[in-house]
Amino acid sequence: MAQIRQEALKKQKSETQKSTEGFVDIGNLAQWTCSSEKSGFPIRLVRDDNIDTYWQSDGSQPHTIHIKFVKRVSIKYVSMYLQYTLDESYTPSTLRISAGTGFQDLEIVTTVQVEEPTGWVHVPVGDFGRNGLLDVHLIQIKILANHQSGKDSHVRLIKIYAPEIEQPAIAVDEIPYTSLQFISRNQLR
């Protein structure tokens, strides 16, 4: 059983790397809040990179997750790890993603139906913005319905993907030193 699970995890990781190649998760730059959480299953668990842990809502639907960035960011995907085989009626089936600069101007970006998901669900929100990217300060994920009419929800992981920006490396030889003091210290220790 453990070997089958490890093989499934490797396959999921490979598929995720292909679809998010050239993008980086920027979720660590945001403040995460939710409409409710069951004791012992806080929202921070969607950021722990462990598919065995999860956030669980506690209350009536819809359940919401708010992802607030300090600065405006340009995003391509909102990706969620959902596991129907383990969570059954706790697994979201209808998700609505909204975005804006704050709560006062949230606009619906897309509504997604997922059928018994097992693994990463990548929602290409960038398709609804300019130049293939969506500029936001705030993302709201609203869980409108669960499979089998379940009440509370489990979400195992969430990642927010933005384009990877390469910083040009400056070679030591390319730095134009002009003073004797700088030239004498231009070697790495």
UniProtKB/Swiss-Prot annotation:
<dbReference type="GO" id="GO:0005680">
    <property type="term" value="C:anaphase-promoting complex"/>
</dbReference>
<comment type="function">
    <text>Component of the anaphase-promoting complex/cyclosome (APC/C), a cell cycle-regulated E3 ubiquitin-protein ligase complex that controls progression through mitosis and the G1 phase of the cell cycle. The APC/C is thought to confer substrate specificity and, in the presence of ubiquitin-conjugating E2 enzymes, it catalyzes the formation of protein-ubiquitin conjugates that are subsequently degraded by the 26S proteasome. Acts as a positive regulator of the anaphase promoting complex (APC)-cyclosome. Involved in G1 cell cycle arrest in response to nitrogen starvation.</text>
</comment>
<dbReference type="Pfam" id="PF03256">
    <property type="entry name" value="ANAPC10"/>
</dbReference>
<protein>
    <recommendedName>
        <fullName>Anaphase-promoting complex subunit 10</fullName>
    </recommendedName>
</protein>
<comment type="subunit">
    <text>The APC/C is composed of at least 13 subunits: apc1, apc2, nuc2, apc4, apc5, cut9, apc8, apc10, apc11, hcn1, apc13, apc14 and apc15. Interacts with nuc2.</text>
</comment>
<comment type="similarity">
    <text>Belongs to the APC10 family.</text>
</comment>
<dbReference type="InterPro" id="IPR008979">
    <property type="entry name" value="Galactose-bd-like_sf"/>
</dbReference>
<dbReference type="InterPro" id="IPR004939">
    <property type="entry name" value="APC_su10/DOC_dom"/>
</dbReference>
<keyword id="KW-0131">Cell cycle</keyword>
<dbReference type="GO" id="GO:0005829">
    <property type="term" value="C:cytosol"/>
</dbReference>
<feature type="domain" description="DOC">
    <location>
        <begin position="2"/>
        <end position="187"/>
    </location>
</feature>
<keyword id="KW-0132">Cell division</keyword>
<dbReference type="GO" id="GO:0070979">
    <property type="term" value="P:protein K11-linked ubiquitination"/>
</dbReference>
<keyword id="KW-0498">Mitosis</keyword>
<keyword id="KW-0833">Ubl conjugation pathway</keyword>
<dbReference type="GO" id="GO:0005634">
    <property type="term" value="C:nucleus"/>
</dbReference>
<dbReference type="InterPro" id="IPR016901">
    <property type="entry name" value="APC10/Doc1"/>
</dbReference>
<dbReference type="GO" id="GO:0051301">
    <property type="term" value="P:cell division"/>
</dbReference>
<dbReference type="GO" id="GO:0031145">
    <property type="term" value="P:anaphase-promoting complex-dependent catabolic process"/>
</dbReference>
